[in-house]
Amino acid sequence: MQKTRIFKYIPVLVFLIVALFASCAHKSGHKENPCRTTTVSNRTEKQNSSRNKRVVNKRSTEKLEGQEIFERYGDAVFMVFTSDGSNAYQGSGFFINNNGLAVSNYHVFKGTGIGMEQIKLLGDDTAYNISQIIQKSEECDFILFKVECSNNNYIPIASLKPKVGEKIYAIGSPRGLENTFSSGEVSQWRAQNLMQISALIDHGSSGGALINEYGEVVGITSGSFADGSQANLNYAWSIDVVKPYL
């Protein structure tokens, strides 16, 4: 899935999916994340925007209903706008702490101009800049970065991966429809860090948050089939691919 314009599709055959993504799966035990990553030095900050304080939510000890998930974390997910100098693109992203630390898909940013990215928060017309790219991996399709804002809402990170059949919720901006909410289950793990999900996602959802019933982020929504069959086959990367760099 992509920035609205160039949707990154997951290969149709399962064995190709595994071959493509298994190389960045965690090994058992406590070994380092084998995803090839790149650390990028700080950028010069261009803008120091002040924002109103947002309510910061903590992990729930009980299962939450879908409406509670969205009420708590809807404004922790944002739209990402990028450009290659000629074309404009749109994707999604989300905060994982209250000081602007955020996650999205690498392919949302790939090939775009440094310094041309902007973030739009729900209910806020201000355009926020990215001050630092901390880590990125094309193989595991994630990018970890810092947005020039603070006191933002965020989604706590899950300590455990969801099991097949567990309820999950996706928040993103498919086709520019800001902060669309959908629900489903984990359909299967196709590689150790790549899950198949039944929650609906589409162009522009790339980089959005996949959340469990306890209000914890478990994945980064990333891709879908596009073979004309209308099959509800969507994919998300486990949030575990980011954990070694936090």
Where are these regions (language model features)?
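C-terminal cap/linker of serine protease catalytic domains
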Residues: 53, 57-69, 80, 116-118, ...
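Catalytic nucleophile loop of clan PA
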Residues: 94-95, 186, 200-221
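Bacterial N-terminal signal peptides that target proteins for export
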Residues: 2-11
